[in-house]
Regions:
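N-terminal cysteine-rich, zinc-dependent DNA-binding domains of eukaryotic transcription factors
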Residues: 1-31, 71-72, 139
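Intrinsically disordered, low-complexity acidic/Ser/Thr-rich segments used as protein-protein interaction/activation
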Residues: 33-88, 92-101, 106-284, 302-315, ...
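C-terminal region signature
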Residues: 71, 371-379, 395-482
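Alpha-helical solenoid repeat scaffolds, predominantly canonical TPR units
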Residues: 122, 129, 167, 348, ...
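Residue position in alpha-helical solenoids
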Residues: 129, 136, 174, 296-299, ...
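Amphipathic alpha-helical protein-interaction segments enriched in hydrophobic
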Residues: 141-149, 307-332, 371-399, 403-406, ...
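Long, well-ordered mid-to-C-terminal structural blocks that present hydrophobic/aromatic surfaces
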Residues: 285-355
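Structured C-terminal portions of repeat-based eukaryotic scaffold domains
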Residues: 337-388
Length: 482
């Protein structure tokens, strides 16, 4: 019997051409992919096969996703955004732009900023497509919100924090508009994510809102004391802060989410001026969180040898925030007005710095003079290390904290470790110069030499910022170099 094989011109779509597979034939045009290669979700890579766009999408899956999940897995980044990018051009182009700027960020030194013409082209295209999509009545609500979220990341990577915050506020307004679809409101007016809503678009909106809240906490800790609009935006978008649930934490990411409200309660103006009963309620919430966290670690993460690097970093990060919050409560309860009250927590500050080193991977052996670059949009250690340097007078601990901030080039959401270290070092130098002698221990810095307040003012449209250090009498301004 003679078999006739019909020849069909291959359309060069990987891993198998549609002209072959659509008619039930096997495509012989390509060898099998290597088992070690990264496979993009079906539809994403094929759109830009063998192009710079495909390369950026692969960089996103290999590098950017890992960075964005350095502490906690995130279903929004890992699954939802990639799925939506298959069918939505503005999200696909935004992801390509983000990957391009991220790649540039990893290549450059601390004195340079990402400047990708390729990335900028796709960024501008994504903006135009997002505006066009949002003007259509039939457009699903999660698309412009996801676009805005990715745009915030791109602005952060370019060092344009003021622009990133403006975009963040715009995203909050969109979330507020779609609030009834995302969550339910209890009798106290607080908004809870509604677990009963199972629409894929609504679940994506819930995940996006959760990430916006994490970014909000970062911004709160950066400029909350000078940006009154931020306080309003937070309350309108995320409601009030909530009591903790009695049920145990199921994972480290859930413990992180519960921590956010406690951080916001303490952020400026925070607990200042609160009466004893309110401070007690807040202290109870912290103790409850600590109990739930300890139970989770004892149950699922007690064997240190079996922990992954991500889990070790996440636990250390949460321990840093735990001690930060506990110390803050003690200050509000017993030490308001005393700039030297922090001296009693010197040992705790040292322990926090050690945990910060674990969270940033500095506890692991590296070749000498090896510095890495990191980018993520989660809460990080730079804000806490800055507060330690501002509070602790001990010169050794201060320099140890600055060393961690300078060891790697980290963009932790809106917090840049290198710039935060510069601001913290300037604070330390101010206090030491005002002490009038060589500082060898905490007591060498007198109370009148202490910096009482630090305010950060972002320069509109620029990569620079102004820091104002307030003393008991007078203040001093300093421009942070870009």
């Amino acid at each position: 019997m003679l078999m006739v094989v019909r020849k069909v011109k291959c359309d060069e779509t990987r891993p198998a051409c549609k002209r072959c597979t659509s008619t039930g034939r096997k495509c012989d045009g390509y060898r099998d992919d290597s088992p070690n290669s990264v496979i993009l979700p079906a539809g994403v890579g094929s759109v830009y096969a063998r192009t710079p766009q495909a390369r950026s999408l692969q960089f996103f899956t290999e590098k950017t996703l890992a960075g964005l999940q350095i502490f906690f897995p995130d279903h929004l980044w890992n699954t939802k955004i990639l799925q939506i990018a298959q069918s939505t051009e503005c999200i696909r182009n935004a992801v390509i732009a983000l990957a391009s700027f991220h790649e540039q960020y990893l290549k450059l030194t601390s004195a340079q900023q990402p400047d990708s013409k390729f990335g900028l082209g796709h960024y501008n295209l994504a903006i135009r497509q997002s505006i066009s999509s949002s003007n259509q009545a039939s457009s699903p609500p999660h698309i412009p919100i996801l676009s805005c979220l990715i745009f915030v990341c791109i602005e952060v990577l370019q060092g344009k924090i003021e622009s990133a915050i403006a975009l963040f506020k715009y995203g909050c307004k969109m979330i507020e508009h779609h609030q009834p679809e995302i969550c339910s409101v209890n009798q106290f007016g607080n908004c809870y994510l509604n677990p009963q809503l199972h629409s894929d678009a609504i679940m994506t909106l819930q995940l996006a809102k959760a990430l916006f809240k994490r970014i909000a906490v970062q911004i709160y800790m950066l400029t909350g004391d000078v940006d009154t609009q931020l306080v309003i935006a937070f309350k309108n978008t995320f409601g009030g802060t909530y009591p903790l649930h009695e049920r145990p934490f199921r994972c480290l990411a859930e413990a992180r989410e519960a921590l956010l409200d406690i951080v916001v309660e303490q952020a400026s103006p925070g607990l200042k001026g609160q009466d004893a009963q309110q401070l007690m309620f807040h202290s109870v919430k912290i103790r409850q969180w600590c109990s739930l966290f300890d139970a989770l670690v004892a149950k699922d993460y007690s064997d240190e040898k079996s922990l992954s690097d991500v889990e070790r970093r996440a636990i250390a990060l949460l321990q840093v925030y735990r001690q930060y919050l506990e110390i803050n409560v003690a200050k509000y309860a017993y030490g308001q007005g005393d700039p030297c009250f922090w001296d009693r927590f010197t040992a705790e500050f040292d322990n926090m710095i050690n945990n910060a080193a674990i969270a940033t991977g500095l506890d692991q052996k590296r070749p000498e003079q090896t510095s890495k670059s990191f980018f993520h949009m989660d809460i990080g250690v730079s804000s806490i290390l800055f507060s330690i340097i501002a509070r602790c007078r001990d010169p050794t601990i201060r320099r140890k904290a600055i060393g961690i901030m300078l060891a790697d080039r980290s963009q932790e959401g809106v917090w840049n470790s290198q710039q935060a270290a510069q601001g913290a070092r300037k604070l330390m130098e101010l206090e030491e110069s005002r002490s009038g002698k060589e500082v060898k221990c905490s007591q060498d810095i007198p109370e009148e030499a202490r910096v009482r307040t630090v305010r950060l003012y972002l320069e509109s449209g620029k990569r620079t910022a102004k820091m104002v250090y307030g003393f008991d009498k007078g203040s001093w301004e300093w421009m942070i170099p870009s």
